[in-house]
């Protein structure tokens, strides 16, 4: 975390605070500009705990960072913790440090005092860096894509996403990708650091929208390659963020990793995909390309190593830096209107954050809630009370007859993007309604893939065999459009 350069006289220790301080490795006369922080995260249980921090100058060397990593690992093992891996982002110093320790792309682990330590690169950071490279270069990949009746090499272009957005936003009421804005397509320097923007543009909704526009000849046929790349990245990001034993929103990869889950087979498929990938016009291979390969190998290695502890499922969501990022957000919020604290302010804010359970109420944070409880806050302040549940039954009378006759017919063709997006939204609402009445089902629901207005909905399905979405009658969609 970046901190403000500042020197403060410490009357208690009779010294100036604010210099680079690496504890046992000594202090230097370089003024600190970063707080190098280590946090322990539970793999089996949802807990977190800040365990160490050091103050560094503008650039800590890779060999020094490697020494600090080993110091922290030794302390953790000495305290009785069984460390199985370390997580870091794509910063060059981090990569050089773990390489010095013995980790590599194909063997993402090193030995420390007889313990195997797996090295993982932060998946949200990988997605963000990949998007930044995709902004500048077309991506070629050796995955067959059907174009004009022939099998060809796929080429993904950012311009296809821009064309899709410009077409999609012309719909008056409903769109295929409502989250997309100009910030997603042309992010500035600060916006390029936002993981949310990268995840929303490289999403299943955008991939489905691209395919729907290609099917209606509103986008060129080679945009199928772009949809393939976007879809694969969405699935891979899901596979590295699963935190429940069941599917979330029907997404088959957004689950815990197990021997019966599709993760291992999908990782094998993605290894080929990323190995043969090329960023056209780039001088060298971007670090994020090998980073995905390294992280897939690392997650698979951890899953294998956990079996010796009789742990057969892995919550992959815990193998990222979100808890640490949320800790930094909590520290900044505890500094009031000063988001760039000095070293002294950092220490005070960290203490406050730990005592208050690392609660981060900042709405503009760069990651999701990690749902981990702090292991030791030194004092318990809050107690959760019992939650009360409302009776789900309702005495509101329901009319025996429902009629949508007389609804004014709109001049919106069923094949239009507007009607397709409306049909998907109506289906989304119907999916979250408890429709047990046979008459209501007849009025509202249609058979899958029987109406042209359901083209986008069919592309939104996560499973090609089993339909999990609701398909609404076109007449009902027209009533919603007219409302």
Q: Model-flagged regions — what are they?
A:
Residues 3, 42-48:
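Short connector loops/turns at beta-strand edges and beta->alpha or beta->beta junctions
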Residues 27, 48-483:
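Non-catalytic regulatory appendages
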Residues 10, 44, 111:
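Acidic surface patches and DE-rich sequence motifs
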Residues 1-39:
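Structured nucleic-acid-interacting core domains from mobile-element enzymes and related host factors
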């Amino acid at each position: 975390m970046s901190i403000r350069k500042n020197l403060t006289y410490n009357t208690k220790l009779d010294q100036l605070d604010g210099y680079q301080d690496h504890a046992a490795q000594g202090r230097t006369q370089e003024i600190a500009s970063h707080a190098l922080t280590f946090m322990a995260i539970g793999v089996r249980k949802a807990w977190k705990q800040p365990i160490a921090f050091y103050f560094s100058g503008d650039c800590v060397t890779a060999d020094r960072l490697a020494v600090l990593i080993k110091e922290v690992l030794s302390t953790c093992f000495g305290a009785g913790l069984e460390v199985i891996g370390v997580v870091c982002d794509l910063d060059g110093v981090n990569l050089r440090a773990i390489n010095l320790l013995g980790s590599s792309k194909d063997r993402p682990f090193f030995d420390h005092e007889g313990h195997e330590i797996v090295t993982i690169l932060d998946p949200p950071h990988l997605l963000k860096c990949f998007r930044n490279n995709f902004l500048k270069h077309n991506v070629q990949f050796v995955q067959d894509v059907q174009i004009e009746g022939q099998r060809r090499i796929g080429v993904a272009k950012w311009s296809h996403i821009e064309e899709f957005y410009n077409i999609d936003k012309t719909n008056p009421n409903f769109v295929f990708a409502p989250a997309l804005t100009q910030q997603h397509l042309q992010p500035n320097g600060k916006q390029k650091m936002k993981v949310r923007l990268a995840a929303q543009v490289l999403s299943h909704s955008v991939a489905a929208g691209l395919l729907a526009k290609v099917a209606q000849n509103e986008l060129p046929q080679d945009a199928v390659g772009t949809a393939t790349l976007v879809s694969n990245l969405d699935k891979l990001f899901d596979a590295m963020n699963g935190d429940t034993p069941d599917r979330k929103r029907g997404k088959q990869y957004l689950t815990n990793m197990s021997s019966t889950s599709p993760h291992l087979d999908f990782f094998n498929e993605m290894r080929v995909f990323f190995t043969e990938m090329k960023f056209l016009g780039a001088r060298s291979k971007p670090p994020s390309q090998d980073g995905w390969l390294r992280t897939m190998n690392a997650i698979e290695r951890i899953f294998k190593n956990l079996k010796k502890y009789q742990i057969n499922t892995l919550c992959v969501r815990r193998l990222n830096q979100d808890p640490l990022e949320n800790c930094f957000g909590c520290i900044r919020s505890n500094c009031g209107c000063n988001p760039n604290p000095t070293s002294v302010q950092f220490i005070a804010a960290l203490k406050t954050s730990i005592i208050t359970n690392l609660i981060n109420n900042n709405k503009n944070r760069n990651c999701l809630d990690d749902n981990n409880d702090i292991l030791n806050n030194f004092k318990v302040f809050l107690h959760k009370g019992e939650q009360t549940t409302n009776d789900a039954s309702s005495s509101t009378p329901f009319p025996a007859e429902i009629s949508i006759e007389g609804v004014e017919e709109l001049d919106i063709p069923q094949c239009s993007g507007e009607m397709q997006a409306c049909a998907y939204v109506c289906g989304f609402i119907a999916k979250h309604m408890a429709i047990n009445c046979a008459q209501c089902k007849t009025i509202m629901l249609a058979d899958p893939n029987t109406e042209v207005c359901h083209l986008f909905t069919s592309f939104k399905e996560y499973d090609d065999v089993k339909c999990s979405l609701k398909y609404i009658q076109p007449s009902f969609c027209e009533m919603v459009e007219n409302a």
